[in-house]
Amino acid sequence: WVYAVFHRPIDAFCADGVGRWLKILFFCGVGVFCLLLGFVAVIGYAGAATGQEKAIVVLGAGLRKDVPSDLLRRRLDAAYAYYLENPEVVIAVTGGQGNGETIPEGVAMARYLEEKGVPEEQIVVEQKSTSTEENLLFAKELLEERGIGADEPMAVVTNAFHCYRARCYARLVGFEQVSSIPASIGLNSVLPCYMREVFAVLYYWVFKTSQSGWISPLVGIL
């Protein structure tokens, strides 16, 4: 609506000189953003779980007091569906206690799965993490205590938009055989979640790849 109201002065400014170059930069930026948006949308479905995983790690996504948010419920349902087909798998649920939450996310996630029928002894509860990286790092430590090493196949359970970056972080913290289980997402959350994820992926490429020696933005595809 801004352009509709001020289109004449904007067109005049962009006709030549600095304005023209700013217009070019703007449209180039929009083009790059759209390419990255498409990359994130497609790549979330790569690296799918094979059914051979020894453990799956469900990443936290917020609570409403002590009830899983819609995003988190979808992740837990995806984990439960995998469990039904692979009943021997160990499920690590991860997440600390954030603002407005009355219990740690990991505790609420374990309760949700137990109510569905997953045995308590097959659930590993992590309840201190505050980020995706910590989710996976702390889960790795707890799984190792259970005798599941970082060299054994595992899968990250998260919403599709988040799968690529989650696989990258899993490898960053030391997991060697990483796949993912993409959960669905509500239609009202698609655009904001994918747009936000573009910037999160850029942050990872700029600030995290140097920690592992990775230089390719394609890390995490396989």
Model-derived features: where do they sit?
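Short hydrophobic alpha-helical membrane-anchoring segments
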Residues: 4, 32-41, 205, 209
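Residue-level signal for protein termini and structural transition zones
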Residues: 16, 29, 46-48
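A transmembrane-helix-recognition feature enriched in membrane-embedded lipid enzymes
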Residues: 190-214
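Membrane-interface helix-boundary motifs at transmembrane edges
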Residues: 9-21
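A structural signal for short, hydrophobic/glycine-enriched beta-strand patches
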Residues: 37-196
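Membrane-embedded alpha-helical segments of integral membrane proteins
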Residues: 1-11, 222
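The feature marks non-catalytic terminal segments
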Residues: 213-222
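Internal/C-terminal transmembrane anchor helices
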Residues: 18-40
